């Protein structure tokens, strides 16, 4: 009998008569019984020519040895992998005390090996934007006196001291922020690209402080900037989209590092890197949820946990009606509609990676961790469900577009929506009849602009549409969206109109979307909150 050991990067094409051939899943290791050594040695040597293998012959066994991938293991060496994402928003890490509570919360789940995603400390993003706006006009010599800059420095340095970590973990970023504001002041402009770079300091500092604290208390952690670990986006500054190349890149970095050092990853939410510009981009406000679900899909984790300051998804905004209740289960469709129409719990686009990866999302309250929260999955039993939640979207502009040209004609709707496309204005809710179209404009895409720009855009829009129709512009409207089982729309609408009639409210527009989970109604702004409270009482506090 004989044994061969082959060392190299490719498996030679050998024609061996074998009684036993075994392949490991990762190691490309085989054993084979041979009748003699000399003939096989010549065959192997010939087959391995130009492949770069070293061949040696011993007795008893043949092994092809190849470098094995490092096994993933936890700090106790048990070979365990990362299990979930835990994402915490700004209010959950707004102070040293809250960061300590979050750390204790994480440690209270000893069976979890989480990836942590953090937002900036509470109010930091708004303060950074305000500081940037002031820097444009204040002059270079006055940058130091910008109130918001002083607030940010004081908050983060105080937090470092109270956590008992070295201020050196954030000093470079505080100095970088100061220099950036000076640059903005010198240039006298704040571009979208610079705005994204400016707000990135918030997440970069919060994650460094939190990671340092975890290490201080003996829980090994490592900080990551999302834009350095593979979050590749479009170059649409302030509202970038994540590209598919992100998923393998993020997986390679996080899984590879975890397998080597078992340090809990602490990742910046909200941020990415433009694929052309290589500049820092942001995913839009609330984009930390999208960061969390993207990581969950990239790593194929068991669950994505989004920790907020409310007990999961609620039946309505508790600021409008304090008696709002927690919703135990949602589908991704329901969650997406809730987010789009104004619920502040989830980012509108954050559900897509979780849905694609079929990964449950659990929304919980970091102030009340024992509360069950809300679990969002691909499907749920809707047989007894009627209404899930009521969402209010304020300050909406409504357009009534009427023309007899619509009657029996084709192409009219195309002309209308081409006008919106040409002016870069998003449409929210749409309803049509034989001779008219009613629609609302997405305030998130319109009201974020300067007042003068908004007025000009609306004037231009009306002017263009009046070339083909009679246009009526109606402002100060609200959308009340009813999220639930639209298969029971007759029952829902019957109760809705009973409530509105008893409160003397007229519905100006109604739309049922193709999502099959949403009915939207348009009312005057001043009537909206009254309607939400009355609807909540009718659907959630009385017998069906």
From Swiss-Prot:
Involved pathway(s)? Amino-acid biosynthesis; L-lysine biosynthesis via DAP pathway; (S)-tetrahydrodipicolinate from L-aspartate: step 1/4; Amino-acid biosynthesis; L-methionine biosynthesis via de novo pathway; L-homoserine from L-aspartate: step 1/3; Amino-acid biosynthesis; L-threonine biosynthesis; L-threonine from L-aspartate: step 1/5
Query: Where does the record say the transit peptide is?
Result: 1-84
GO biological process, alphabetically ordered: lysine biosynthetic process via diaminopimelate; threonine biosynthetic process
**Does this entry carry the keyword Transit peptide?**
yes
The ACT domain sits at 401-479, 481-544
Name its cellular compartments: Plastid, Chloroplast
Catalytic activity, EC: 2.7.2.4
Q: In which tissues is it expressed?
A: Expressed in stems, leaves, floral organs and young seedlings.
Q: What class of enzyme is it?
A: transferase
Per UniProt, the keywords (alphabetical) are: Amino-acid biosynthesis, ATP-binding, Chloroplast, Kinase, Nucleotide-binding, Plastid, Repeat, Threonine biosynthesis, Transferase, Transit peptide
The reactions it catalyses are: L-aspartate + ATP = 4-phospho-L-aspartate + ADP
Q: Looking at the keywords, is RNA-binding present?
A: no
- What InterPro entries does UniProt report for this protein, alphabetically? AceGlu_kinase-like_sf, ACT-like_dom_sf, ACT_Aspartokinase, ACT_dom, Asp/Glu/Uridylate_kinase, Asp_kinase, AsparK_Bifunc_asparK/hSer_DH, Aspartate_kinase_CS
**Where is ATP bound in this sequence?**
87, 90, 119
SUPFAM superfamilies (UniProt xref):
ACT-like, Carbamate kinase-like
- Any Pfam family the entry gives: AA_kinase
Q: Which GO terms describe its molecular function?
A: aspartate kinase activity; ATP binding
| Gene Ontology cellular-component annotations | chloroplast stroma
The residues listed in the UniProt record as binding substrate, with positions renumbered to this chain, are 203
Any known activators or inhibitors?
Allosterically inhibited by lysine, but not by S-adenosyl-L-methionine (SAM). K(0.5) for lysine in the presence of physiological concentrations of substrates is 12.5 uM. No inhibition by threonine or leucine and no activation or inhibition by alanine, cysteine, isoleucine, serine, valine, methionine, glutamine, asparagine, glutamic acid or arginine.
Please describe what this protein does.
Involved in the first step of essential amino acids lysine, threonine, methionine and isoleucine synthesis via the aspartate-family pathway.
Family, as annotated: Belongs to the aspartokinase family.
Cited PANTHER family: ASPARTATE KINASE (PTHR21499), ASPARTOKINASE 2, CHLOROPLASTIC (PTHR21499:SF54)
Write down what this protein is called: Aspartokinase 2, chloroplastic
Q: Which gene encodes it?
A: AK2
């Amino acid at each position: 009998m004989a044994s061969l050991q082959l060392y190299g990067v490719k498996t030679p094409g050998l024609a061996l008569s074998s009684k036993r051939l075994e392949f490991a899943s990762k190691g490309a290791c085989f054993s084979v019984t041979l009748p003699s050594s000399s003939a096989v040695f010549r065959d192997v040597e010939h087959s391995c020519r130009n492949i770069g293998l070293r061949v040696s012959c011993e007795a008893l066994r043949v092994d092809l040895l190849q470098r094995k991938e490092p096994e993933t293991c936890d700090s106790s060496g048990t070979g365990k992998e990362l299990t979930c994402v835990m994402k915490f928003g700004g209010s959950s890490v707004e102070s040293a005390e809250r960061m300590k509570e979050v750390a204790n919360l994480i440690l209270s789940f000893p069976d979890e090996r989480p990836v942590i995603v953090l937002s900036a400390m509470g109010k930091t993003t708004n303060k950074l934007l305000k500081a940037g706006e002031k820097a444009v006009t204040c002059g270079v010599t006055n940058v130091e006196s910008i109130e918001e800059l002083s607030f940010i420095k004081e908050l983060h340095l105080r937090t470092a001291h109270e956590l008992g970590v070295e201020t050196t973990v954030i000093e470079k970023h505080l100095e970088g922020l100061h220099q950036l504001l000076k640059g903005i002041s010198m240039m006298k402009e704040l571009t979208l690209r610079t705005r994204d770079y400016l707000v990135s300091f918030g997440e970069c500092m919060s994650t460094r402080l939190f990671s340092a604290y975890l290490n201080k208390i003996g829980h090994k952690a490592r900080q990551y900037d999302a834009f350095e670990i593979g979050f590749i986006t479009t170059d649409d500054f302030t509202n970038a989209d994540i590209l598919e190349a992100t998923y393998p890149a993020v997986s390679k970095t996080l899984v590879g590092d975890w397998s080597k050092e078992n340090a809990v990853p602490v990742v910046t939410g909200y941020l990415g890197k433009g694929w052309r510009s290589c500049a820092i981009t942001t995913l839009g406000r609330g984009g930390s949820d999208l960061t969390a679900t993207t990581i969950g899909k990239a790593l194929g984790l068991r669950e994505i946990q989004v920790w907020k300051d409310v007990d999961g998804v609620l039946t309505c905004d508790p600021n409008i009606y304090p008696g709002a209740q927690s919703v135990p289960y949602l589908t991704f469709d329901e969650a997406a509609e809730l987010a789009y129409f104004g619920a502040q719990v989830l980012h509108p686009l954050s559900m897509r990676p979780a849905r694609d990866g079929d990964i449950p999302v659990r929304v919980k309250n970091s102030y009340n961790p024992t509360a069950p929260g809300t679990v969002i999955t691909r499907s749920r039993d809707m047989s007894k469900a009627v209404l899930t939640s009521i969402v209010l979207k304020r300050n909406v502009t409504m357009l009534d577009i009427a023309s007899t040209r619509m009657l029996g004609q084709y192409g009219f709707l195309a002309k209308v929506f081409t006008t919106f496309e040409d002016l870069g204005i998003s449409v929210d809710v749409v309803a049509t009849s034989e001779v008219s179209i009613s629609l609302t404009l997405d305030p998130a895409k319109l009201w974020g602009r300067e007042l003068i720009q908004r007025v000009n855009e609306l004037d231009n829009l009306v002017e263009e549409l009046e070339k083909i129709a009679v246009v009526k512009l109606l402002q100060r409207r609200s959308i009340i969206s009813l999220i639930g089982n639209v298969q029971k729309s007759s029952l829902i609408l019957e109760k809705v109109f009973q409530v509105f009639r008893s409160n003397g409210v007229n519905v100006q527009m109604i739309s049922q979307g193709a999502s099959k989970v949403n009915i939207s109604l348009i009312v005057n702004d001043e009537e909206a909150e009254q309607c939400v409270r009355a609807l909540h009482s009718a659907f959630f506090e009385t017998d069906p």
